[in-house]
Amino acid sequence: MAAIKLGSTTLNVPRVVFGTATLGNLFVDLPDETKLEISRQWFEAGDTVVIDTAGKYGAGLALEVIGNNLRALKADPEKVIVSNKLGWKRVPLTSDEPTFEPGAWVGLKHDAVQCISYDGILECWKQGNELLGEGFTSQFLSVHDPDEYLAAATSEDDRACRMDDILGAYKALAELRDQGICQAIGVGSKDWKAIAEIDEKVKLDWVMLANSLTIYRHPQELLDFVESLHRRDVVVFNSAVFHAGYMVGGKSFDYRELDLSNADDREIADYRDRFFALCEKHSVKPAQACVEFALSPPGVASIALSSSKPERVTSNVLLANTKLPEAFWREAKELNLMARDYPFLG
């Protein structure tokens, strides 16, 4: 799997970054053997493995599993980059189920609380490395879902305080980077405008878009922002490009089920029907189209893909190296399945 230089750093990143929410028991408690095999397959994909994780994933369980699996596989730390999204800290579980994202995480033995501030983010970073365990540390660091933290504000004053918390967290991360303790800092968010707001205030090395730059949704102002990042050597990772699986046949669109009595939701369902019909006509898998589109803008270095099945790890890597016929993209434009003036395909 080919690697691309990460902005102004000396690091190279592959076309696929491996997501790890399933290792933290998102929706399913996989056997340890399955989790180990998923990790084993990462190393079949290329020379350097980039792992995207977070303290929120299973209240730290994903970090523990990653560390245990890497040691079991005798992985070379020089060939592994762990990207840890910080902002949630493991705490004892004192209720029947975790208090964060009820119903999403299965079989957890700990809870997690949000800690976004200068001191809070350092606590999350230290705990994250402790959970990874001997031999491995997080080299890419970011604040986890700052858009949601800002959206929870109850007033303009509260939002300003929350932004100060976020900027305090980034001050701490920048100090770690400047000291050479981590190699790069970034931001990931479902709301790309929150990324743009933080980008104005923080010197970032990378950003991770989620649910934002997809075949279904690619506003021109976002493409302009990605171009601006590219000019400044800020690398873009793209993620959640299937809209929570909906564009490849899943039931949920952006983590919710559609209400077909709602006109906007009917439009989404109609889009998918027309998209699937075009894919069938050209003998294209919907996932192939979603991934090639997501990687097409200059500046998008990698795509984050995750799987609960070991055998899908390799197929995910193949998705990132598949080129579809130009005729497919031209017809997608003719059918208004993508912007007619989209410059990078068709």
Per-region residue spans from a language model:
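N-terminal binding-site loop/beta-alpha segment at the start of enzyme catalytic domains
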Residues: M1-E97
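Beta/alpha (TIM)-barrel catalytic core signal, keyed to glycine-rich beta->alpha loops juxtaposed to Asp/Glu
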Residues: A3, T34, K126, E130, ...
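Short glycine/proline-rich turn/loop motifs
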Residues: G19-A21, D47-T48, A104-K109, Y149-A152
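Active-site mouth loops of central-metabolism enzymes
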Residues: A21-E33, V106-L122
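Generic structural signal for well-ordered alpha-helical scaffold segments
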Residues: R40, G67-R71, W125-E130, A174
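Short, flexible, mixed-charge acidic loops at enzyme active sites
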Residues: L93-A104, G250-Y255
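A solvent-exposed, charged loop/short amphipathic helix patch at secondary-structure junctions
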Residues: E101-D111, E156-R159
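An active-site-proximal structural segment forming one wall of the substrate-binding cleft
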Residues: Q114-T137
